[in-house]
Amino acid sequence: MDFEYIYPIIVLFGSFAIILAVGVPITFAIGLSSLFSILIALPPDAAISVISQKMTVGLDGFTLLAIPFFVLAGNIMNTGGIARRLVNLAQALVGRLPGSLAHCNILANTLFGAISGSAVASAAAVGGIMSPLQEKEGYSPAFSTAINVASAPIGLMIPPSNVLIVYSLASGGTSVAALFLAGYLPGILTALALMTVAALYAHRHHYPVAERINLRQFLSVFRDSLPSLLLIFIIIGGIIGGVFTPTEASAIAVIYSLALAAIYREINVSKLRDILLDSVVTSSIVLLLVGCSMGMSWAMTNADVPELINEMITSVSENKWVILLIINLILLFVGTFMDITPAILIFTPIFLPIAQHLGIDPVHFGIIMVFNLTIGLCTPPVGTILFVGCSIGKISIDKVVKPLLPMFLALFVVMAMICYFPQLSLLLPTLFAPS
């Protein structure tokens, strides 16, 4: 390839790395590096016009309305006492297993993540409740924190999931309903894998089981948590039944969560104002990131980056499974230093064409990509959930790494199963996704 074609690529990624290194927020790093790359091919006025146009077009999508609505619904759920009720339900369901509180943490994170759609919120809300309980029962603080950190991202695989909506946008319109359905089985499988690790660890360290509860107590706990659980069935049931679109489902989630907060009487006017402000800030950051990433996507396409990466990977091997392994390794590496949303926006346009050329379904590849990048949320140096979990558990990161290792092994096994057994992701969309 001639230097004149490589030059825009060098400028794009070189300036991106330099701008990030000096501490500029990733959103502006993406936008500026894209502009610098486009300036090589176009005059300044035209380059600015193109980048602004691509940002605007990238945000001009009805599906994107779901992001601020789901963010708001999640924030209402976080403050509305939902986590405590789900923890009580999880304890009632798995309390008799060895290491019951660890299993409770995993199950509560799975349920809460499925309702709030936020891994960070799950780690903070559930961890804030479970860490003191586990410490009181003699659990190692490092182990309890590791369990919370490893299980918090499960909610990103199960609807409502903003990262799956972002992937739908970055992939050119993959069905959000199909992606939502595709995440269920991998999410449940991840929870079971982590519970297996927790059971082995608990058996080895002789952790206690919870006291047995009677049917009346269980029904009381279940009744208390049922209104929260209904949100999951309302959202996915309405989408599958064709009653409403994923975007409309997000608005319904806000109305339902507000009604639930009013019933529970956990949110006052002051808290609601803070929730709205936080939701506006979070949504603005995400949507600005989406817009800038659309500009970078165009800059990469203009510089033939996807074709270059395709040639490099296929030159190593033409075997479908080997190429998929290479993509997985790259995504695992990317996840260690880049947050999940920008990683999806930047690397989906690069890797999805390769995956489609190999005959991999875009829905399946989306689940592979999201699962891969969620592991990065638990690893240094940029592991958001790792930092949140350690802050909640009041423990240093270096002490959590050792108990995290067997959990990472379990996650890698699940990742291999998701990659090489496509039906784990595609079974439910095939059966239930609306046409």
Swiss-Prot record:
Lineage, top-rank taxon, reads Bacteria
Localization: Cell inner membrane
Gene Ontology CC terms: plasma membrane
Cell inner membrane as UniProt keyword:
yes
Q: Which N-terminal stretch is annotated as signal sequence? A: none
Keyword annotations for this protein? Cell inner membrane, Cell membrane, Membrane, Transmembrane, Transmembrane helix
Kindly list the cysteine pairs connected by disulfide bridges: none
- Could you state a single Gene Ontology molecular function term? transmembrane transporter activity
Q: Where are the transmembrane segments?
A: 9-29, 57-77, 110-130, 146-166, 176-196, 226-246, 280-300, 321-341, 343-363, 367-387, 408-428
Give the way it sits in the membrane.
Multi-pass membrane protein
Which family does the entry's similarity section mention?
Belongs to the YiaN/YgiK family.
- Give the NCBIfam families listed for this entry: dctM
Q: How is this protein named in the record?
A: Uncharacterized protein YgiK
Q: Which organism is it from?
A: Salmonella typhimurium (strain LT2 / SGSC1412 / ATCC 700720)
Q: What is the lineage of its organism?
A: Bacteria, Pseudomonadati, Pseudomonadota, Gammaproteobacteria, Enterobacterales
Gene (name only): ygiK
